[in-house]
Swiss-Prot record:
A Gene Ontology cellular-component term: plasma membrane
Cytoplasmic face of the membrane: 1-31, 97-112
Highest taxon of the lineage: Eukaryota
Name recorded for this polypeptide: CASP-like protein SELMODRAFT_406854
Keywords: Cell membrane, Membrane, Transmembrane, Transmembrane helix
Membrane topology classification: Multi-pass membrane protein
Species whose genome carries this gene: Selaginella moellendorffii
Disulfide cross-links: none
Listed transmembrane segments: 32-52, 76-96, 113-133
Coiled-coil positions: none
Family named by the database record: Belongs to the Casparian strip membrane proteins (CASP) family.
Quaternary organization: Homodimer and heterodimers.
Membrane listed as a keyword: yes
Amino acid sequence: MGVASQSSVANEAGAAPEASIQQTLRGFSSPTSLLLRIATAVLCTLTLAFLVTSKERKEIASIDIVAIWSNSKALIFLAVVSGICLGYSLLHAAVFLVMLSGNRKPLARKKALDWMVFLADQVFFKIFCWFSIRVSSRRSKAGFV
């Protein structure tokens, strides 16, 4: 096997992982990702709106009891987590708009932004799952009391 054929085999073997990484990173700055971020922001806004405006009124032994979201620590926690999710989604939607509009930026900078978004998504997902588990456990404790 000659030197030229060895280098072409090495290039083909090394190019495949690089191409798959680039294709994966391209997915983070696609218009579909932007639409998903906007949909998440809309759903978080609806969650907050329903949570804050809902009231439940019951009469027990001629005593009028009004239940609102701020009476329960679990619902306050849910409102805070929904607000954080809303802010995060809007922030990343803005980052995607900047990434989609700035096609004149160097590829290395775009890769860095894609990796930043990927890592931030992973960290946020872990934290959001932890918050969701805490909210559900607090909610179940409130249900047993």
